[in-house]
Amino acid sequence: MAQNLDAQYNAAVERFRSEEFPMIRVDSIYLDHAGTTLCPKSLLEAFARDMAGNLYGNPHSASNSSQLSTSRIEDIRLQALQLFGASPDEFDLVFVANATAGIKLVSESLRARDGGFGFLYHQASHTSLVGVREEAQSSICLSEDETEELLAGSTTSLDLVTRSPPGAVLLAYTAQSNFDGRRYPLTWADKVRRAHASGCTPICTLLDAASFVSTSPLHLGESKAAPDFTVLSFYKIFGFPDLGALIVRKQAWHLFESRKYFGGGTVDMVVNFKESWHAPKNGFLHERLEDGTLPIHNILALGSAIKIHQGLFGPMRTVSSHATFLAQEMITNLQNLHHSNGEKVCTLYSPYPKPNVDGNGWNQGPIIAFNICTSNGSWVSLGEFEKLASLRDINIRTGSLCNPGGIAIALALEPWEMKRNFSAGLRCGADNDMALGKPTGVIRASLGAMSTTSDVDRFVAFIVEFFCDDGAASRDLQTPRVQPSLASGEAELCVDSLTIYPIKSCAGYSIPHGKQWQVRPEGLAWDREWCLLHRGSGQALSQKRYPKMALIKPVVDLESGRLAVGYLGEPIPYLPERVSVPLSHDPSVFRPSTYVSAAPSRVCGDQVATKIYHDDELNEFFSKAIGVPCVLARFPPGSQHGDAQRSSKARLQKHQITTDQESDVQEVHPGSGTTTDSTWGNDKSQNILLSNESPILLINLASVDALNQEIKSRKGSSAVRIPTSAFRANVVLRRTDESRPDGAQGLPYAEERWRGLTIGNQTYTMLGACRRCQMVCVDQVTGCRGDEPFSTLSKTRRFDGKVFFGVHMAWGPGSPSNNVVAARGDVAYPTIEVGERVLVHV
């Protein structure tokens, strides 16, 4: 019966989803409803009609428009209370920005009481709840057992936060973990109130219902059994508006009496000349706490949101049943995935949803936290998972999910481990998410009212396609450790092409045939010396987020001594045909250094002291071209000093180690964030400019050809050849004699086993394989994004959970054959040229 009802619900959503939620494209999957759910088009249309058809004024005035606003706001306040089963006779609702703002309002009010307050919080609390401990006189994080003891009447935890008697004790907990979806009894507030009714210090309760109410009905009922404070965010239920609520039991109103601050609209009278005196409003609690003008339009939109949501999806209990059914399906399907050797693909941290013992609701919400393992038992990097998910337009959350207790318990992370990881540079959202082979975050799939069985099926199919080893072709390749057969120094390759990318992540400039190009320790001359910085954040822009950057074409004009830049996209009104800047380090074209230091730039996670151009017309050219407010900045050679210095991140990978190299590889001490590194080559770290990882990136045409053959074998006639430009390499090598049988250098991917190269008369050291992301899928001619070649690379070139193609290398004056000539005090660096012969050192 339940399945039939859900089938009806699912069919109804399928019928109207394309019309109501056009932002979910046919190939998209949205699985981040715990972050925010999606807003139906009819809600936006209803809100627009309301705004266009009615005149709403500031509620603090007495005009007709103001009175209309006041009347509507109070009606919607009542609707919101009724939505959560809260009688206006026993509760008041305070509009706030979001759940976090409600939590902060409570904590600041309790802090102002004589003696402050003690704080007890459950281990599954969101970071916004944990942060309250900084406002408290003392605080304790409660485990499951300690919480049960407190509810049973134990004063052990209570005594620890009341040694210096506080004005109150606050117990905070979540109705549903935003980490793994576990639900906690809504009866805790009543239980703790009854168990400690005779105590000297009153215990008040704060319920974080933000995650819970997104897909489940909340009925606060009688105030004597309800939490003193309940916080939530409406956008998690309706997608729009961006608004939150703090619902307060009237018996707890007195806890706000010590609050100091007052804003406009919350007082009846203020004296500030000769005397300081004010009279707070003494009616409803919300009149004293809603400082300043309310977010009028957000509140008005809430009225439409409640009506539209109920019209589309019915009562919340129906939404809850549907979302729970989908969660059961996803958990079952993920649990049943196995590699060909029998090992499980997924490690799940969320339990299978079951009805509560009392028959009221479920013990688990529609949130599934998990990680993925390879067939050999190693963890799949969250960064690699996100790259593939982004490629398939799967919108999902990864990381520690703003839940420190949940992540620590699920991954068995001790405090010392988390501190060590932080010291090693690991951050939530950073690309490096493994510490000594152990994950530091999880994947979270969360479902909502407009999710369907198709979303679940297609997501599971995605996991199978990219992460399930069926035995036919291993998803995580283990390259044999073999000794290359050809002797070192045999010539068979030459330089096919040379390309530099003067502006990071923009189009490349091909070095003409016959042109000798200078090579420096930081890389090829003029390569990635400039970048575009976001005006607001100072973050360097990249094609990964802004693919139109591929259409910005720089040209190095050595005769005029300038870098000329044009735009190859569709014509943009009033956009100059081209702009240019001097190649010389002319200080007059940059903003003063004091201006730069106030807003440091960030490139690939590094803080960099770039020099920003002050020409407004120049910066406007780039802003218009890619549609993002940005400025042009430069990080020329010689800028690397102190904290601004950038070093190569490239290193030898496990799959590159041949038999005779094993003794050259050593383990790195714990805390470094890596597991192995190379010790051969230059013993000094290589300085780099604005490249991601190394001074020079090299690819082999034999490898590009092999990859294209693989794509063709998988996609047949629909396959489109991937050009070398997709990989944005500086140096492309090719065979000099195509008629010869394949030798070691002619084999695809043989470059990953080379120790070094001699090009012309200069020696280069190989630093390690190049880790790839979905940016290789951006067409460098059109700026459009596809799914190849990363889709095929992830299935054929994945090692240790990471995808590689091409190799990093560096030239350095430390090699015996590399002579740097000093002439008249200037350094004369060597050159490289298209067509030069290449000797391989294996």
From Swiss-Prot:
The modification N6-(pyridoxal phosphate)lysine is found at K236. Its EC number is 2.8.1.9. It catalyses: Mo-molybdopterin + L-cysteine + AH2 = thio-Mo-molybdopterin + L-alanine + A + H2O. Residues 637-680 are annotated as: Disordered. One of its GO terms (molecular function) is pyridoxal phosphate binding. The keyword Transferase applies. Its cofactor is pyridoxal 5'-phosphate. The active site is at C402. Gene3D superfamilies: Type I PLP-dependent aspartate aminotransferase-like (Major domain) (3.40.640.10). Keywords: Molybdenum cofactor biosynthesis, Pyridoxal phosphate, Transferase. Residues 663-831 form the MOSC domain. Pfam families: Aminotran_5, MOSC, MOSC_N. One of its GO terms (biological process) is Mo-molybdopterin cofactor biosynthetic process. It is an enzyme of class 2 (transferase). Pathway: Cofactor biosynthesis; molybdopterin biosynthesis. Belongs to the class-V pyridoxal-phosphate-dependent aminotransferase family. MOCOS subfamily. Sulfurates the molybdenum cofactor. Sulfation of molybdenum is essential for xanthine dehydrogenase (XDH) and aldehyde oxidase (ADO) enzymes in which molybdenum cofactor is liganded by 1 oxygen and 1 sulfur atom in active form. This is Molybdenum cofactor sulfurase.
